[in-house]
Amino acid sequence: VVLVAPTSLDFDRARFAANCFRDGAAVILNCESLKPEETNRLKDFFTGCVYSLDGTMRRAAKDVFIMVPKGVGLDEDSQDESEDEA
């Protein structure tokens, strides 16, 4: 599992986490320290990564997202009801 908790918009670190995801690691993206527009940019970046690799992305909290690669399940009970906003 790779934890990404940026304090500013950092695509080098995001690229590292995306490469880990591509290689089969789950990624937790904690954007609580970012501005809303920065959160949206990172969320969009990772949404594209997850989609292109047939993974799954779920909202765990307001600005926290969990991404798992294809073939790895998520406990449905842990999903936030607002997942559609992710």
Residues of each region from the PLM?
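Positively charged, small/polar-rich N-terminal and surface patches that mediate targeting and assembly
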Residues: 1-27, 32, 47, 51-86
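Short, solvent-exposed loop/turn segments at secondary-structure junctions
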Residues: 36-38
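Generic recognition of short, well-ordered alpha-helical segments
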Residues: 16, 40-41
